[in-house]
Each structure stands twice: as C-alpha cells, then as structure tokens.
UniProtKB/Swiss-Prot annotation:
The gene is smpB. Required for rescue of stalled ribosomes mediated by trans-translation. Binds to transfer-messenger RNA (tmRNA), required for stable association of tmRNA with ribosomes. tmRNA and SmpB together mimic tRNA shape, replacing the anticodon stem-loop with SmpB. tmRNA is encoded by the ssrA gene; the 2 termini fold to resemble tRNA(Ala) and it encodes a 'tag peptide', a short internal open reading frame. During trans-translation Ala-aminoacylated tmRNA acts like a tRNA, entering the A-site of stalled ribosomes, displacing the stalled mRNA. GO terms for cellular component: cytosol. This is SsrA-binding protein. InterPro entries: SmpB, SsrA-bd_prot, SsrA-bd_prot_CS. It comes from the Bacteria. It comes from Mycoplasmopsis agalactiae (strain NCTC 10123 / CIP 59.7 / PG2) (Mycoplasma agalactiae). Belongs to the SmpB family. GO terms for molecular function: RNA binding. PANTHER family: SSRA-BINDING PROTEIN, TMRNA-BINDING COMPONENT OF TRANS-TRANSLATION TAGGING COMPLEX.
Length: 147
C-alpha cells in the first residue's frame, strides 16, 4: 500500500469512531496528479447527495498546463448497504461527520480513499488527548535510553 496523501491536520479535534475504504471516480489528469503525489486533503470533507457519497474540497494539483477544475466534487464508490449503514450512524450520533483520512494505492494499484466517521471533541477531551500523547512520547524516550 503506497500512501498518496494523508489528512493529519484535518482530523485534529476529532475522535475517530470507525474507518471504511471507498473507491473514487477520477478523471485521467487526476490519476496522473495522484501518481505524482500532488493531492491535498487538508480542508476536505464528505457529504451525501441523492444516496451517494461525494468528496469535496480535495485539491488535486494541475497536471501540466491543462485548464481544469481542481476542487470539483468527486464521487466515492461504495456498496449501497455500506452507504445506508454509514448514513444511519451519522444521523443517530450527535456532532458526527465523515472525513477522508488518506488516499492511497491498494495492492492492485487502484486508488482508494480511507474515510472515517468522526466525532468532534470538546476542549477538555483535546487536552486529555494531548497529555496522553505527550506521556506516550516520554515513555518511548525513556525506553530507548535504557535499551
């Protein structure tokens, strides 16, 4: 699995509930841009439209000198049952949304998007998460000094 782009900053302040894999419908120049690893997912999100999923605000950089729409909405490819299940969970849970976590090539060289059902964290949860992360870094540092 070769990662094209990750969405680290876009997931700050969110707690990941579950992850799914989806295909993506791309044009030829977008595939070439993905192979060149010039994709940005920072402010992107996923929305429902007529029972289908769409990726919005994902920036695929221009390939060569083509006049193209870089920030168009791209259709995500999932089974209908998975989409319905995801929509039901989104409606049932409060303050949840769907965000892309990364775009990658799978083992068959197909471009896939990993999407996550995420829930917004409040300020106290963010502080706890930062403390936990700092403690883990400190423990790793201490372990490396003794080994």
């Amino acid at each position: 699995m070769k990662v094209i782009s990750e969405n680290r900053k876009g997931l700050y302040g969110y707690k990941i509930i579950e992850k799914h894999e989806a295909g993506i419908s791309l044009l030829g120049w977008e595939v070439k841009s993905a192979r060149a690893q010039t994709v940005n997912l920072t402010n992107s999100y996923i929305f429902f439209k007529k029972g289908e999923l769409f990726l919005c605000n994902a920036n695929f950089a221009k390939y060569m000198l083509l006049k193209v729409e870089e920030d168009r909405d791209r259709k995500l490819l999932m089974h209908k049952k998975e989409i319905i299940r995801l929509k039901n969970k989104l409606d049932r849970l409060s303050s949840t949304t769907i965000k892309p976590t990364k775009i990658y090539f799978n083992n068959k060289s197909k471009i896939k998007v990993e999407i996550a059902l995420v829930q917004g964290m409040n300020r106290a949860d963010k502080r706890e998460d930062l403390k936990k992360r700092d403690n883990e870094k400190y423990m790793q540092k201490v372990k490396s000094n003794y080994l």
